Amino acid sequence: MKVQEIHKLLGNHSQGTYIDIGAFDGIKVNNTKYFEDIGWVGIAVEPHPTSFAKLESNRNCIKENIVIADHDGVSEFNWSDDAPMTSRVDMSGQKERIHDMKDVVKQQLPCMTLNSLCEKHNITQVDFLKIDTEGYDCHIINSIDFKKLHISFILFEMWEHHEELCYKLAIEKLINNSYLEVTKDYDIAFNDRFNRYFLKS
């Protein structure tokens, strides 16, 4: 789904708030730059140090060099300059993917939940949330307190072959919080390769 289609679903508003979790350099394979360019405000989160340095110079939004997790504190982050877009939080079920990376650095990074990030920046309404954390997306969704944070549109990657139960619970949680999965024709139950799109009804 093109970002312009998402914007249309959100009413083509000229003002809004986005959060980009796993922003990489803020340019490549990125769909929040569009919203920044039309005047929206937001936060871009990228734990990979080399990618974050590029993000700092590429974007004008708030930038956070942290891990978004299912808890506040510290998290082990595995990264490599050999594959910066596939670095990830260390967790069970992802070990084989970490081993595929060369020259892996294991680093302890500060982490917080999405709710804590939004509280830090006094955000209660998010119009567009993008999550791309190479297999950790479902954990982030399952940790969101939707009673405290209103999110209009959520885009995330689906790695169900690694975390089948986690993603099942995440989708159930979204449905139970009045989200509908969006298709190219704006119906439900469309899987765009790895990406899943949910709109608050």
Enumerate the language-model features and the residues they cover:
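Phosphate/nucleotide-binding beta-alpha loop and adjacent structural elements of enzyme active sites
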Residues: M1-S201
